[in-house]
Amino acid sequence: MTFIEEFINKGYFHQCTDLERLTSITKESKIAAYIGFDCTATSLHIGSLMQIMILRLLQKHGHKPIVIIGGGTSKIGDPSGKDEARKTITKEDIARNAEGIKKSLSKFIKFGDGESDAIMLDNAEWLDSLYYLDFLRDFGSHFSVNRMLTMDSVKLRLEREQHLSFLEFNYMLLQAYDFYYLSKHYNCSLQLGGSDQWGNIVMGADLTRKISSKEVFGMTTPLLTTASGAKMGKTAAGAVWLNEDLLSPYDYYQYWRNCEDADIVRFAKLYSELTNEELVVFENLAAEDINAAKKQLAYELTKLCHGKQEAKNALETSVKIFEQGQIDENLTTIVLEPEMLQAGITAFELFHEAGLATSKSEARKLIRGKGAKVNDQLIEDENMVINTTFLLDNKVIKLSAGKKRHILVKI
């Protein structure tokens, strides 16, 4: 299969400015294509996983992936899909976040100097040096305010009578300039992004064609939700991060292990590298034994993100906990100051401290609802004092919230 054929087959396709022509060009030659990422956290999460898999697919077919870190545009904030202005972040935050994002991406794609090796650029490199009057003179006449006002990112905010600052309104101009700059300096001919970016992408393609007469394209992916309508990347416990310093490989495994039944075949197609033949076998397995299929899905996706050994460890830990009732030290672990446990800490405070509840009131509610266990024993008194007498032989205390969330406490 060609890049475009596999792109469509895997369910990544939503819209393209000229699919027939792009298909022809990518069959005949290798291109450079880019995807941009906000520089607002020290790791990407699974909400970006489809875009990452597309970068990987580009590289697989010999095309050059360009990753844009929005160091410049992050200072403004994209209004697309937002009800209010995003907080601006500092240069120091951007530098730290860029390092973490490259760590996330390096799990999936190869960076380097080769023809199909990925490169990562910060758009602050060219946006920070733009002179406002020069920009207006050279590019302002190519943008139609009438058209900009019809774009969903702007129109919806105005219809709801929500504040839209001139700062945010300029975001789409700068993103359009990114495409022009990458086309000129890196021979980039394709921008990819989520369907909410369609207006911005089309503006960039139009600007580039008008100024340089180059043939460029835009292509978008569908916005994904789970079968129940939840946004990809977030859970009640927080974001499903790709970097292990923010989320352990075991917890990453457990996210996929616990996904909704209706999602597993779709997720296998989107996020794994199973062949079409293997996907048919997987779909049959899901019809016969949904839990076995979930374990395979979780293993495959954890292996891709964290490596074979971590995926194997996560699988074994999950089996020990849920099928054999054992405690495994590969579980997420928090360390408490010895004095805290020696003096004793109430159950609700400990569950909050361990991250099994987002607030103390939620921890109380969890315990009252009979959803909390200490060392596999149900606790019903939220004020019960947990101290060193609860330490097991391996010097840990096992906390459980519901059937699927477990944490070890050490001192």
UniProtKB/Swiss-Prot annotation:
Keyword match ATP-binding: yes
Record GO cellular component, one term: cytosol
Gene: tyrS
Protein family membership: Belongs to the class-I aminoacyl-tRNA synthetase family. TyrS type 1 subfamily.
Domain S4 RNA-binding span(s) in chain numbering: 345-411
Positions with a binding annotation for ATP: 234
Residue ranges annotated as motif 'KMSKS' region: 231-235
Enzyme Commission number(s): 6.1.1.1
Record: residues binding L-tyrosine: 34, 171, 175
Catalytic activity from the UniProt record: tRNA(Tyr) + L-tyrosine + ATP = L-tyrosyl-tRNA(Tyr) + AMP + diphosphate + H(+)
Keywords, comma-separated and alphabetical: Aminoacyl-tRNA synthetase, ATP-binding, Cytoplasm, Ligase, Nucleotide-binding, Protein biosynthesis, RNA-binding
Coiled-coil portions: none
GO biological process: tyrosyl-tRNA aminoacylation
Pfam family, one: tRNA-synt_1b
Subcellular location: Cytoplasm
Protein purpose: Catalyzes the attachment of tyrosine to tRNA(Tyr) in a two-step reaction: tyrosine is first activated by ATP to form Tyr-AMP and then transferred to the acceptor end of tRNA(Tyr).
Source taxon at top rank: Bacteria
Motif ('HIGH' region): 39-48
Subunit text: Homodimer.
EC class: ligase
Name listed for the protein in its UniProt record: Tyrosine--tRNA ligase
InterPro entries according to UniProt: aa-tRNA-synth_Ic, Rossmann-like_a/b/a_fold, S4_RNA-bd_sf, Tyr-tRNA-ligase, Tyr-tRNA-ligase_bac-type, Tyr-tRNA-ligase_bac_1
